[in-house]
Amino acid sequence: MVQENKNFATAKAKSIRVSPRKLNLVAAFIRNMKVSEALVQLTFSPKKIAKVVKDCLQSAVANAENNLGLDIDRLVITKATVGKALVMKRVMPRAKGRATRINKFFSNLYITVTEKEDN
C-alpha cells in the first residue's frame, strides 16, 4: 500500500454556544479564502462568533505547520463546515399560567486548510 503525501490539515471546535445559522454566515464568508486574508477579515469582523472561528482557523494553521510541515503562506481554506450539536431546552413563563419552550442551539465547526501551488 502506497501512502499519499497529505497536504491538508484540519481543526474542529465542538459545542459552540451559537446557532448553526449564525455560525454558517461567518464560515461561508471565509470559505475558499487564503488563510492570511481570512485572519484579517475575522479580526475586524463585527460578529461575536468570529473570534471562535479565528481561534479554530489558527489551530488548523498550527496543525498544518507543526504536524505536516506545510508552508503557511500558501494555505487556503478549502472546507469550513458547520453542523448541529445539542439543543438545550428551557422554559419561559408566559401570561395566564402558560409556558413556552426556548431552544438554545449549539454548533460544531470543522475547518480544513490545504496547501495550494502558486500559479
Swiss-Prot record:
It holds the Pfam family Ribosomal_L22. PROSITE patterns: RIBOSOMAL_L22. Keywords: Ribonucleoprotein, Ribosomal protein, RNA-binding, rRNA-binding. The keyword RNA-binding applies. CDD domains: Ribosomal_L22. InterPro entries: Ribosomal_uL22, Ribosomal_uL22_bac/chlpt-type, Ribosomal_uL22_bac/org-type, Ribosomal_uL22_CS, Ribosomal_uL22_sf. The keyword Ribosomal protein applies. SUPFAM superfamilies: Ribosomal protein L22. Disulfide bonds: none annotated. GO terms for biological process: translation. Transmembrane segments: none annotated. GO terms for cellular component: cytosolic large ribosomal subunit. It comes from the Bacteria. GO terms for molecular function: rRNA binding; structural constituent of ribosome. Belongs to the universal ribosomal protein uL22 family. Part of the 50S ribosomal subunit. This protein binds specifically to 23S rRNA; its binding is stimulated by other ribosomal proteins, e.g. L4, L17, and L20. It is important during the early stages of 50S assembly. It makes multiple contacts with different domains of the 23S rRNA in the assembled 50S subunit and ribosome. The globular domain of the protein is located near the polypeptide exit tunnel on the outside of the subunit, while an extended beta-hairpin is found that lines the wall of the exit tunnel in the center of the 70S ribosome. This is Large ribosomal subunit protein uL22. It comes from Rickettsia felis (strain ATCC VR-1525 / URRWXCal2) (Rickettsia azadi).
